[in-house]
Structures are given as structure tokens and as C-alpha cells.
């Protein structure tokens, strides 16, 4: 009873808590990422006028609680999933924009690396887009994944999307996430007929031709974004905007038609989860493209091939 009281107090006071499936040894940790936002976006900071929120240290002692909870889970040999609102990393709709403060973004990634042996996956939202992220070890190995489902709200500062709902399939005894089905509402059609008709958009494993949901599998998927002979990025981008009509997507998406720069931006946001590493990723690849020269036949052929693949895939899936 005392444990329940403490958890309730933490939830009411600061919005974070954990639940356990003790018989099967898995745990879900719910974080209040509002406590870790940068100063401009931190509503909690404005609400309390800074008196109870120190954004440079440990607001409401969430970090201390988070790491103690992970230590307990490791000692009990539990599998852990993490749920929050605002994810670490860069907004894929707004180049280079991060919402968590630099301190908390860096610390979060460090904690995930440290406990990657028990953290099976992470679930976030906030950006309204259908996307994912891969967390890497200090030596560059993929060690954890983040799933971000699109929102029901059809609008976002970075561009619109159709409303989306996601249903995860998981193994009840271990908590292992096996797959998910993404549903969407075709908003123009719904407005036209006056009825909401939710339809399956895709299933993760089939859509991206994956065998399982792991950090390595999602790393390989992101790597396919940079390969000109692969449809992965075209499919990803269609899902990213929740099957937005092409005429709307052309206005908002990547500043126009899909291209190498667009694919590069999304590849770097998926695989580089802090502003500096994102900038380094984007700059290094952009420099590689630029060094080939605009008149190089090989580059021209590659870009032409990419356009043909994009057109073929859009005709196939739209």
C-alpha cells in the first residue's frame, strides 16, 4: 500500500509513474517529458516561474527516480518499455529542430545506452508524424528503437497529415512487440461524405519487408533510405504524412517532389538524435553529393533513376 501511495504522489505531483506485470517480468515506465523541454517550450517552467523547475539538473527528481526504477528492473531481470510524449532527437518536419533541452536530450540517450540490455523499446509522439528512431551505443552499434505514431490531429507546424491510429501486436507473456497495424482516416473523403471511415494503411513488417522489430532491423531500414535502388524511403515518406494526398504533399513535403536531399534529411533525423550529430550527418552526406559535381553523368543518372522509382512507387501505392 505504501508503494502505491508513493507512486500516486509521484503521478499527481510530477506526472511520471511505472506499472509492472510481475508474473511475466516486464515493466512500462511512463515519463513526463514536459519537465525536460527546452526553455522556450517548457510550459512547466513558465507555470512555476522556475521556483520548482531547474531545467539544468533534475526537475521534480524525475532523473533520480527513472534511474532507480531501471536499476530495480535490472535487478529483477525485467523487460522494460518506455512511454513519453516528446521524444529525443530532431523533428523530421523541421530541419534541425529539437524540443528537449540539450542537457536532457543528451542525458536521456546516455541512460538508454546504459540500460539497453533491459530496455526493449520506446514509444513517443508529439511530432504528429509516422516515424521511428534508432539509438546507438558509443561505438556505433544499434542498441534501442523508438516508435512514434502519427496523431489524430490533422495539423502540425511542419505540415498537415491525415489522422492516424496505431494498434500494436505483442506477445503477452514477454511483452515483446511483434508488429503493428497503422490505421488512417482519409480526411478529404470523410469531409465529403460526412462519415469517418478508418482504414488499414499498412502493417509494419509486411510494408517494409522486415522479419522482426529490433534496433538492428530498423537501422537496416534507415540505411535503405540512402540506396537509390530501394523503395523503402518512398514507402516511409508516404506513411510519414499518413497517406496525405499528393497535391498537398507536394506543397508541404520536402519543399516539393521527393529527392536525394529529402531522403538524406529523414535518414539523419532517424539515426542522429542530437542537433550536432544531425548537422554533421547532413553536412557530410551533402558534401559527398556536391563533390561529385552537378554535371557528373553518374550523379545525373542516379537522380534520374530515383525520380523514376519515386513515380513508380507512388503510382503503385496511391
Q: What is the meaning of each model-derived region?
A:
Residues 41-64, 71-124:
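Active-site-proximal segments of metal-dependent phosphoesterases and phosphodiesterases across multiple
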Residues 1-72, 76, 129-318:
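Metal-dependent phosphoesterase/phosphodiesterase active-site architecture
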Amino acid at each position: 500500500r505504501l508503494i502505491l501511495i508513493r507512486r500516486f504522489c509521484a503521478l499527481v505531483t510530477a506526472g511520471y509513474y511505472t506499472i509492472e506485470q510481475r508474473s511475466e517480468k516486464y515493466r512500462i515506465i511512463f515519463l513526463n517529458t514536459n519537465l525536460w523541454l527546452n526553455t522556450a517550450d517548457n510550459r512547466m517552467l513558465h507555470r512555476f516561474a522556475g521556483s520548482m523547475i531547474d531545467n539544468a539538473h533534475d526537475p521534480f527528481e524525475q532523473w533520480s527516480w527513472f534511474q532507480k526504477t531501471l536499476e530495480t528492473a535490472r535487478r529483477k531481470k525485467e523487460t522494460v518499455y518506455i512511454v513519453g510524449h516528446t521524444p529525443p532527437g530532431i523533428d523530421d518536419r523541421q530541419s534541425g529542430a529539437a524540443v528537449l533541452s540539450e542537457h536532457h536530450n543528451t542525458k536521456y540517450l546516455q541512460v538508454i545506452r546504459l540500460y539497453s540490455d533491459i530496455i526493449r523499446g520506446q514509444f513517443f509522439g508529439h511530432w504528429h508524424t509516422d516515424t521511428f528512431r534508432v539509438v546507438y551505443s558509443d561505438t556505433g552499434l544499434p542498441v534501442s528503437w523508438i516508435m512514434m505514431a502519427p496523431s489524430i490531429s490533422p495539423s502540425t507546424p511542419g505540415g498537415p497529415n491525415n489522422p492516424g491510429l496505431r494498434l500494436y501486436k505483442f506477445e503477452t507473456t514477454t511483452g515483446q512487440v511483434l508488429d503493428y497495424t497503422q490505421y488512417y482516416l482519409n480526411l478529404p473523403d470523410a469531409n465529403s461524405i460526412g462519415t469517418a471511415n478508418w482504414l488499414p494503411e499498412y502493417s509494419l513488417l509486411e510494408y517494409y519487408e522486415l522479419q522482426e522489430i529490433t534496433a538492428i532491423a530498423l537501422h537496416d531500414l534507415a540505411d535503405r533510405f540512402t540506396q537509390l535502388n530501394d523503395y523503402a524511403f518512398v514507402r516511409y515518406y508516404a506513411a510519414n504524412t499518413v497517406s496525405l494526398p499528393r497535391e498537398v504533399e507536394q506543397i508541404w513535403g520536402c519543399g516539393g517532389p521527393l529527392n536525394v536531399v529529402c531522403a538524406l534529411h529523414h535518414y539523419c533525423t532517424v539515426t542522429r538524435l542530437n542537433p550536432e550529430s544531425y548537422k554533421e550527418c547532413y553536412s557530410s552526406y551533402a558534401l559527398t553529393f556536391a563533390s561529385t559535381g552537378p554535371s557528373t553523368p553518374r550523379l545525373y543518372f542516379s537522380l534520374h533513376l530515383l525520380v523514376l522509382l519515386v513515380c513508380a512507387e507512388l503510382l503503385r501505392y496511391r
